Design a protein with these regions (language model features):
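Extracytoplasmic
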Residues: 70-75, 142
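Ligand-binding loop in jelly-roll beta-barrel domains
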Residues: 113, 118, 127-155
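Short histidine-centered beta-strand/loop micro-motifs
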Residues: 86-91, 108, 115-116, 134-136
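Short, conserved beta-strand element in jelly-roll/cupin
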Residues: 77-81, 92-106
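Short acidic-glycine-tyrosine-enriched beta hairpin
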Residues: 44, 70, 80, 104, ...
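A short beta-loop-beta micro-motif enriched in histidine and acidic residues
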Residues: 68-71, 84-96
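A short, N-terminal "cap"/entry segment at the start of jelly-roll beta-barrel domains
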Residues: 2-72, 114-116, 123, 160-168
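Structural recognition of the beta-strand scaffold that forms the well-ordered cores
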Residues: 96-99, 106, 122-125, 144-148
Length: 168
């Protein structure tokens, strides 16, 4: 009879342990994560890439540029078909984007800000903390020339997860 009174307690303890393990396992599962959005409808051509081998400081006409060591400078021609997009991305360093033809819309994850740029206008992408997507929202082709300042050997673009609060 002594064994019979402990059996329900053992069963209850086993159920409690299994329930706790199940809850812990469910909590350990990765939450739904935003996935990277690959580029589409774009073609990029590397025009040139080179290394500034030494540190330098330049201050001219309100422009200040300072490097602590070598950096790469890359220039890329990007063509956006109608609806073409870079996908959400960042750059390891700043990028100066000049719209050559057409119109390009910049969507920034921070604050879900959007701004359009026409041919002849230039905008700055700020580097690794500036998650953004650029897209041709017109019916014609848009072309850009982009100059990147990068750590030596770094890629010009790195895919980033789509921000949940900025649906496109």
């Amino acid at each position: 009879m002594h064994q019979l009174t402990h059996r329900p307690l053992r069963l209850a303890a086993t159920v409690a342990v299994l329930a706790a393990a199940l809850i812990a396992a469910l909590l350990a599962l990765p939450r739904e994560q935003a996935t990277a959005t690959p580029p589409s409808g774009t073609a990029a051509e590397l025009l040139a890439r080179g290394t500034i081998a030494q540190a330098g400081h330049v201050r001219v006409a309100g422009i200040k540029l300072a490097t602590r060591g070598p950096i790469d400078v890359a220039t890329v021609h990007v063509t956006f078909q109608p609806g073409g997009s870079t996908g959400w991305h960042v750059h390891p360093g700043p990028a100066l984007v000049t719209v050559k033809t057409g119109r390009l819309t910049l969507h920034r994850a921070k604050g879900c800000r959007t701004r359009a740029f026409n041919a002849g206008q230039t905008f700055l992408e700020l580097g690794p903390d500036d998650v953004n997507l650029t897209r041709n929202e017109t019916g014609g082709v848009t072309e850009t020339a982009v100059t990147f300042l990068l750590p030596v050997g770094a890629p010009v673009t790195v895919d980033a997860p789509a921000p949940r609060r900025c649906p496109l």
